[in-house]
A protein has these predicted regions:
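Glycine/proline-rich low-complexity spacer/linker segments in large multi-domain proteins
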Residues: 44-45, 64-102, 176-185, 562-590, ...
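Extended carbohydrate-recognition surfaces in non-catalytic/accessory domains of CAZymes
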Residues: 1-27, 78, 82-86, 91-94, ...
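Beta-strand/loop-rich accessory regions of lumenal/periplasmic or secreted enzymes
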Residues: 76, 175, 549-556, 571, ...
Length: 905
């Protein structure tokens, strides 16, 4: 084989003399892609399957009390590689712990299996215990509760295969909500002497398939999941225990209750954590062969690979059998469908009837207990859910592709899941961006992806970066949206005039007594009242009405009610006070301000209209008390806006129409950088620039022809006596023209960089968009421009805030401008130009830290910006209601100079 590189590993070790006479086993947790093992120069054996442990009996080869040489070879590729075609970095080498252990060679519990179950009323429990013995002896079985107190004991005279059942009255049940674990302690004795002790964690739970649903302990739970590769930005396949605990903590923090081990068995410690902290697991076998095709050529139909398909699934089940967190076995991923998978399904269902078995390629009618498609769109999900002939639960094994700035439209998936009983959730692709830490061109740290290392290796560029969190485990902005729609407590209005709210407990197994409710009333974005409710006894799947002492409101402004639910005590990895759910209700709706710009009048002083200087050949100048504006006669744009000696527009720049954004990964996947290209720099032919005086205000109107998009555009500026400017951007489309939609309709104004401070009343604090804003509460926020930029691994549109009531750009002294509009609008302010974040017609090998900041603050004001979408990243765009089709649009906003303006501290 060409370029089949080899890694050779050698280590000299001292085996304790006390191990003499014992059976010594070598454990290799994960070696990619295979290994040949020698001990003291003698060949021991061979193993493949990169993601399952290999164990070898080294007893005949080792010399206890002496130095011993362990040596093994690892090949880059082997025949098993055809079944390991996963989409991720293809590393080689040792990825998990390697160690030796010693046991009694004649007497041991060779295998122990526990199968928990509940009775038909889900009340009492039973634990089937199956032992495989080497030799014989007495095995004492002791079931301990979480406080290490004995619940029940049994004693068996054991040899060969032995089975028993332990009955437990009303045990604590294991679920992701209530991950209660018992410990079964199996002690092997001979003549009163303890030979070995094996503890096994036990969770009492029952998995059933009934009425087109999967039930856990009789309840049709919702799977709020993500797919997780084992990847670390520094260790690659080597993921530390601390990193795994961190991942579990993040999952619990953002309300994830399920994980799919894509696309191979994980480190055993991961399943231990899922057992302990409560995560439902889809345990997947290490099979993916999409490179070989899905038709007749698939390896799923190749008899030569039948044994490999079967063994990989058998070993996956055998090593994970005792974990209560494993609810589903998955036969593999993207590997076609055929007899090889059918044989694996049959074997698992016979070996372990206590769990569900799934496989995406089996579709609706093949051998799978779950219909688990990938990237089903909303319509297909609804259609399947309404089809009564389909009697398998719908749980997408991959959905809501989280590539770059994404997860727009995530709400709509969960609207369907909460509507249809058969649709029980899914697993977001995927949990963590899989890039590696690297040094970029300018010496800054970047996260490298495919193509960064050379131009000849197979690569899918940044398609490894589809995570809810960054490689170093910082939540990406879209993770906050997921955390919101995955939450388990929901608040809706009751009779708000009486302070009544309705609280729905979406949990299936626990009431809300572990939480307290905090509420805040906001008047015009500011908190004016607050309170707390400690007694929340809302039963699972029930709604209760709670009355809050809200007091009086008025119709004068917008009133909002924030409600959040927090832990009373530490729970698992989450601290006391952690917010598990929240909602924001409207008490009195927002009313947009009048766009009737008036002069500022002072008592006993005559109002002086602005002065127009119309004689300059290059500029139309409008001046007034403490301000000066200049319009370029060549293009009609406002190029100077000076107030109290301070320029609001950076020299050389202008306030200009804006229809473009730096394409997101989803935009690129749909080819929008080309399909929408007419809007990137549309030709703007100035046909007239006029000014007139009305009511002691100057009105400047610039009229444009936009031939490349078959439209007309009017920019109208009304300037009052203090330099406030009402801007109206009005576009009229040609109804007969066929022109693409646009990314946004608005304007951009590059300002001097020292406008570093932002205050706004809108959604925040993280970026949010028209189709991704459920998590972002309305409030008054004070932030810096530096804080607006989110360093997605590949540069793209970011930093936008939506539903803005007012927005201020301020310098350190609190001086600047305030923006209000005729309706809530979107805005962003970055130290980057749109052009600098835009790859152009095709993706380049670019990284956000390598993009140079501009010496300006680029303010974008939008009537609307297109949504982000999340169905996939290779063609499907945002829902129609979140698109901006070609048509007539009008956007009116007012720029008002402000001094010493600080709303909040």
């Amino acid at each position: 084989t060409v370029n089949n590189h080899v890694g050779s590993y050698r280590r000299e070790i001292m085996v304790p003399a006390s191990w003499n006479g014992k059976e010594i086993i070598a454990h290799f947790g994960s070696v990619t892609s295979n290994m040949y093992l020698w001990v003291n120069g003698k060949y021991v054996g061979y193993s493949e399957d990169s993601k399952l442990e290999a164990e070898f009996n080294l007893t005949p080869y080792l010399k206890p009390g002496q130095k011993n040489l362990i040596a093994f070879q690892v090949f880059r590729w082997c025949d098993g590689t055809y079944l390991e075609d996963q989409d991720f970095f293809r590393y080689s080498g040792v990825g998990r712990d390697c160690y030796l252990y010693a046991r009694n060679p004649k007497q041991q519990i060779a295998d122990i299996r526990v199968t928990p179950d509940l009775d038909a009323q889900y009340q009492n429990g039973s634990l089937a215990v199956n032992l495989t013995m080497k030799g014989k002896g007495t095995v004492e079985l002791e079931l301990l509760d979480a406080q290490n107190k004995a619940v029940t004991t049994q004693s068996l005279n054991a040899s060969g295969k032995v089975s028993t059942t332990i009955e437990v009255s009303s045990p604590h049940k294991w679920t992701a909500e209530t991950p209660y674990l018992y410990t079964l302690r199996a002690t092997l004795k001979e003549g009163g002497k303890t030979i070995e002790v094996i503890p096994v964690k036990v969770g009492f739970r029952k998995i059933e398939l009934k009425n087109a649903q999967i039930l856990v302990n009789g309840q049709p739970v919702l799977f709020k999941g993500a797919d997780r590769h084992e990847m670390d930005p520094d260790g690659g396949y080597v993921v530390s225990r601390e990193r795994m605990i961190q991942d579990i903590q993040i999952m619990k923090k953002f309300n994830l209750n399920a994980v799919r081990t894509c696309h191979y068995p994980d480190d055993n410690f991961w399943y231990d954590l899922c057992d302990k902290y409560g995560i439902y697991v889809v345990a997947e076998a290490n099979i993916e062969s999409h490179g070989m095709g899905y038709g007749e050529e698939t390896l799923a139909k190749n008899p030569s690979y039948k044994k490999a398909h079967l063994e990989r699934n058998q070993r996956n089940v055998q090593r994970g059998f005792n974990h209560p967190s494993i609810i589903f076995w998955s036969l593999g991923n993207e590997a076609g469908y055929g007899p090889n998978f059918e044989a694996a399904y049959d074997w698992i269902k016979n070996e372990d009837p206590s769990r569900a078995v799934q496989y995406e390629q089996a579709g609706k009618n093949g051998k799978t207990d779950i219909f688990c498609p990938m990237y089903y769109n909303y319509e297909d999900c609804a259609k399947y859910s309404e089809d009564n002939s389909m009697q398998k639960p719908l749980i997408q094994c991959e959905y809501a592709h989280a590539m770059g700035n994404s997860q727009g439209g995530f709400k709509e998936y969960w609207d369907l899941i909460r509507k249809y009983p058969k649709y029980q959730g899914g697993f977001i692709w995927d949990f963590v961006d899989q890039s590696v830490r690297w040094t970029g061109k300018n010496g800054k740290m970047i996260y490298a992806y495919g193509g960064d290392f050379n131009k000849f290796d197979a690569s899918d560029n940044n398609f490894c970066d589809n995570g809810l969190i960054s490689p170093d485990r910082v939540p990406n902005p879209h993770m906050y949206e997921v955390g919101y729609y995955y939450q388990d407590i929901w608040t809706t209005p009751g009779d708000l005039s009486k302070g009544e709210i309705k609280v729905y407990n979406e949990n299936f197994f626990r009431d809300l007594s572990a939480y307290y409710l905090e509420w805040e009333m906001l008047k015009g974005g500011k908190v004016v009242r607050s309170g707390r409710v400690d007694d929340l006894k809302v039963a699972p799947q029930q709604t209760s009405t709670i009355r809050l002492d809200l007091g009086e409101t008025c119709q004068c402004t917008e009133w909002l009610l924030n409600v959040s639910y927090k832990l009373k005590n530490r729970e698992g990895l989450l601290p006391a006070g952690h917010t598990v759910a929240k909602d924001q209700l409207t008490l009195n709706p927002y009313k947009a301000p009048s766009m009737d710009l008036k002069n500022v009048e002072t008592t006993n002083i005559e109002t002086k209209a602005p002065v127009v200087q119309d004689s300059d050949a290059n500029y139309l100048i409008v001046e007034g008390c403490g301000f000066r504006t200049e319009f370029n006669r060549e293009n009609g744009y406002l190029i100077k806006y000076e107030v109290n000696g301070q320029d609001m527009i950076k020299e050389g720049e202008a306030l200009t129409p804006n229809f473009w954004r730096a394409p997101t990964d989803n935009d690129f996947g749909a080819g929008l950088q080309k399909k929408y290209a007419a809007w990137k720099n549309p030709e703007m032919k100035l046909t007239s620039l006029n000014q007139r005086m009305e009511n002691k205000q100057v009105i400047v109107e610039a009229v444009y022809d936009m031939p490349t998009v078959s439209a007309k555009l009017n920019l109208t500026y009304v300037i009052n006596n203090k330099g406030a400017i009402k801007v109206t951007q009005k576009m009229t489309a040609d109804k007969n023209a066929k022109v693409s939609p646009m990314f946004r309709f608005g304007m951009q104004m590059p300002m001097p960089r020292y406008f570093e401070n932002i205050e706004y009343y809108g959604r925040g604090p993280v970026e949010n968009y028209i189709d991704r804003k459920g998590n972002a509460d309305l409030a008054i926020y004070r932030q810096t421009v530096d804080e607006q930029f989110y360093s997605y691994i590949r540069p793209q549109e970011n930093g936008t805030k939506s539903d803005i009531r007012w927005w201020k750009m301020l310098n350190e002294a609190g001086n600047g401008i305030e923006v209000v509009a005729s309706a809530p609008f979107s805005a962003s302010a970055l130290h980057y130009t749109i052009e600098s974040l835009d790859d152009g017609a095709r993706k380049d090998q670019r990284h956000s830290p390598e993009v140079e900041e501009a010496d300006l603050t680029n303010l974008c004001l939008d009537k609307v910006q297109m949504g982000l979408g999340c169905v996939n990243s290779w063609g499907t765009i945002a829902l129609p209601e979140y698109q901006i089709p070609y048509g007539d649009y009008e956007f009116t906003f007012i720029l008002t100079p402000v001094k010493h303006s600080i709303e909040i501290e």
